[in-house]
Curated annotation (Swiss-Prot):
CDD domains: GT28_MurG. This is UDP-N-acetylglucosamine--N-acetylmuramyl-(pentapeptide) pyrophosphoryl-undecaprenol N-acetylglucosamine transferase. Belongs to the glycosyltransferase 28 family. MurG subfamily. Keywords: Cell cycle, Cell division, Cell inner membrane, Cell membrane, Cell shape, Cell wall biogenesis/degradation, Glycosyltransferase, Membrane, Peptidoglycan synthesis, Transferase. It is a peripheral membrane protein. It is an enzyme of class 2 (transferase). GO terms for biological process: carbohydrate metabolic process; cell division; cell wall organization; lipid glycosylation; peptidoglycan biosynthetic process; regulation of cell shape. It holds the Pfam family Glyco_transf_28. It catalyses: di-trans,octa-cis-undecaprenyl diphospho-N-acetyl-alpha-D-muramoyl-L-alanyl-D-glutamyl-meso-2,6-diaminopimeloyl-D-alanyl-D-alanine + UDP-N-acetyl-alpha-D-glucosamine = di-trans,octa-cis-undecaprenyl diphospho-[N-acetyl-alpha-D-glucosaminyl-(1->4)]-N-acetyl-alpha-D-muramoyl-L-alanyl-D-glutamyl-meso-2,6-diaminopimeloyl-D-alanyl-D-alanine + UDP + H(+). The keyword Cell wall biogenesis/degradation applies.
């Protein structure tokens, strides 16, 4: 029986690609045995929901932690010992890390034990974990071209960022001519700066006939809903479709993308993988405090391809955001061109492609 370990932790941007690849590998190789190793973040709960056995290791970020980093050797030694024991017990044929500090030690331990190893990098600017691991793992899978030459070229392949299979079907949704539909996404947790910017221009958007669907995030949902109700008070409803829909979290993202004519969003790797696979034009506002400002680089990649416009968050106060949104929605030819450019950057089969590569590594385990 073939055995695969996937390892990562911390945020959904790392965890969901790992789960997507694990699920693809199990579908492509019935009987495959998969173990998820992570830290104390949400990965344990998410792995359980996916039906995967999970092992938690002590793991903490070191980069930028100052004096707290002095304790790193102690928990790292403990984590190495635990990881080594689990790897020896599970006896994997291949181990793949998906970034995040919780994904470092299992990959490093597996490499030292002679197990084939790989990593996947979601962002255009690699994190510290993958920068280090990329020097000695057998394979590196990336979402964006490795233009900076961070990883060894002979062992690196751009296969994309794994997403849910239903997202790509949004690209074939029937067009809705004459509509002006804006989908606003701030990531799974929402984004207060984006919520505030959209609420400030909501009356202008509605006056221009724009329909808005906004994922506010759980923490900001009540506040944004109250603001939206205040804007709608006294307005006469137009047509059968609601003018504004505020949600704390959108479960059916495929349907949301199929509905939208334009997406206003952050520039996280998963969001951009979904936007391109769905073939949607986008207006991107990168999160300015992301590690190494990788969202700005992510957004610039799509902007250069003609698939998106990118606006720095600190430029929002001086920007005619309403005019920008209304101008884009009022130019169907430009939206079509941006959508086609987005599709041109899409790699919608990333989960299957990475899974196949890992299964091939496992099949040739003894040939390393």
């Amino acid at each position: 029986m073939t055995r695969l370990i996937v390892t990562t932790g911390g945020t959904g941007g790392h965890i969901f690609p790992a789960l997507a690849v694990a699920e693809a590998a199990m579908r492509l190789s019935p009987g495959l045995d998969v173990l998820f190793i992570g830290g104390a973040g949400p990965e344990g709960e998410l792995a359980a929901k996916a039906g995967l056995p999970f092992v938690a290791l002590p793991a903490k970020g070191v980069f930028g932690r100052g004096i707290k980093a002095l304790a790193a050797p102690f928990w790292m030694l403990r984590a190495f010992g635990l990881a080594g024991a689990r790897i020896r017990e599970f006896s994997p044929d291949v181990v793949c890390g998906f970034g995040g500090y919780a994904g470092f030690i299992p990959v490093a331990a597996a490499r030292l034990m002679g197990v084939p190893t790989a990593i996947h990098e979601q962002n255009s600017v690699p994190g510290v974990t993958n920068k280090v691991l990329g020097r000695f793992v057998d394979r590196v899978f990336t979402t964006y071209p490795d233009e900076g030459g961070v990883f060894p070229a002979t062992r690196t392949k751009r296969l994309g960022n794994p997403i849910r299979a239903d997202i790509a079907r949004a690209a074939s949704a029937a067009p809705h001519p004459g509509t002006k539909r804006l989908l606003v996404l701030g990531g799974s947790q929402g984004a207060k700066a984006i919520n505030d910017a959209v609420m400030a221009i909501l009356p202008t958007l509605l006056d221009a006939g724009v329909k808005v669907r906004l994922q506010a995030g759980r923490a900001d949902f009540e506040r944004v809903t109250t603001q939206a109700h205040a804007v709608l008070a006294g307005r006469e409803a137009k047509g059968d479709e609601p003018e504004v829909v505020i949600e704390n979290f959108i479960d059916d993202m495929a349907a949301a993308y199929a509905w939208a004519d334009l997406v206003l969003a952050r520039a996280g790797a998963t969001t951009l993988a979904e936007v391109t696979a769905a073939g949607k034009p986008s207006l991107l506002i990168p999160f300015p405090f992301a590690t190494h400002d990788h969202q700005t680089v992510n957004a610039a990649f799509l902007a250069r391809a003609g698939a998106a416009q990118s606006v720095a968050q600190n430029h929002l106060p001086g920007l005619d955001l309403a005019g920008t949104v209304i101008g884009l929605l009022g130019d169907p030819a430009r939206l079509e061109a941006m959508g086609q450019a987005a599709l041109g950057q899409a790699l919608p089969h990333a989960a299957d492609d990475i899974a196949r590569a890992l299964l091939a590594m496992a099949a040739h385990k003894g040939e390393r």
